[in-house]
UniProtKB/Swiss-Prot annotation:
GO molecular function: 4 iron, 4 sulfur cluster binding; metal ion binding; rRNA (adenine(2503)-C2-)-methyltransferase activity; rRNA binding; tRNA (adenine(37)-C2)-methyltransferase activity; tRNA binding
Reactions accelerated catalytically: adenosine(2503) in 23S rRNA + 2 reduced [2Fe-2S]-[ferredoxin] + 2 S-adenosyl-L-methionine = 2-methyladenosine(2503) in 23S rRNA + 5'-deoxyadenosine + L-methionine + 2 oxidized [2Fe-2S]-[ferredoxin] + S-adenosyl-L-homocysteine; adenosine(37) in tRNA + 2 reduced [2Fe-2S]-[ferredoxin] + 2 S-adenosyl-L-methionine = 2-methyladenosine(37) in tRNA + 5'-deoxyadenosine + L-methionine + 2 oxidized [2Fe-2S]-[ferredoxin] + S-adenosyl-L-homocysteine
Essential cofactor(s): [4Fe-4S] cluster
EC number(s) stated in the UniProt entry for this protein: 2.1.1.192
Organism annotation: Salinibacter ruber (strain DSM 13855 / M31)
Keywords: 4Fe-4S, Cytoplasm, Disulfide bond, Iron, Iron-sulfur, Metal-binding, Methyltransferase, rRNA processing, S-adenosyl-L-methionine, Transferase, tRNA processing
GO cellular component: cytoplasm
GO biological process: rRNA base methylation; tRNA methylation
Descriptive protein name: Probable dual-specificity RNA methyltransferase RlmN
GN (gene name): rlmN
Pfam families the UniProt entry points to: Radical_SAM, RlmN_N
Amino acid sequence: MPDVKTASHTVGTAEDRVDLKTMGRAGLKDFVAEHGAPRYRGDQLFNWVYGKGVSDFDRMSNLPKRMRRGLQRDATVEDIEIVEQQQAADRTVKALFELPSGREAETVLIPAIDERGEARRLTVCVSSEVGCAMGCEFCATGRMGFRENLTPGAIFDQVWHMNEVAQEHFGRPVTNIVFMGMGEPLLNYDAVLDSISILTDEDSLNLSAQKITVSTVGLARRIKDLADDQLRTNLAVSLHAPDNETRSRIMPVNEAEKTSLPALKEALQYYFDKTGRQITYEYCLFKGVNDSETDARNLADVTRWAPSKVNLLMYNPVEGLNFERTSEAQLDRFVQVLVQEGVTVTVRRSRGQDIDAACGQLANEGEDA
């Protein structure tokens, strides 16, 4: 390929070629070096693919013609596109993306609107997988099962395109990213880390790592890996119950000893000791399941060992699932107990419910089993 001579520049089939969007900067530099080109050509490729959004090798004008021919033969740049878009009454936007495999993933743009009607913050909720293997009993995505891991480029493209949507609808770029869409991010660990590296690169979207939150059901080993890899992103743990018995009933991942509450606590202790970063706990309230005052006190005991905050969510109903949202009165009592126990707590109000874009509702209805 690259700067070396080639016997032929016949374009191979898509199956034969390497998708450059499976790689970040380091991977692109390795790729060109393995094909005989200087490593700086990988930096140039990165700028074209992730900085300018160019997938046509002929347009990459600072690459030698011979290298462009080699890339056409050996590589491809697989983009994903929005095939459907909806806007909710609260101005939340949900987009459906088609992947190269033909499967689809959903992404949500969530505006925080101020008193003047302007968006002071624009958050993209990205998917890291199609479907999810975790099987949480209350989640629409979990009912799908696992279908496909997204590449770093497919994760990046969600933000790239939603950034364009943000400019179109709100006149400003995306400010925050949360890995809280379809899938368990830490089960697609390498691709998620590569995508974060791309998104925060100054030659790409140049987003702040401190504006990115990675959410997990609590995969203990991978939480330790996050600590070791020294990401400056935020960590959110989908807790949803303060005791092993209840959590195992609604979140099957908790049944295994290595991902149970004690194992999770030990991993979070490791994470905090290594990073010193505050931990966020996500806690969705289900009527009669985890919303009692005793549950609130137990939640305080589970979370206050280190600087943390608790985000309370009201359940977003999913057709066919036997969960109900707690009452506003019970929510108020729950909050009151947490505050009395010294817990920092925020009530997160759902956005985009009328277009099934709220937490736990992402599941493309057209997806075959």
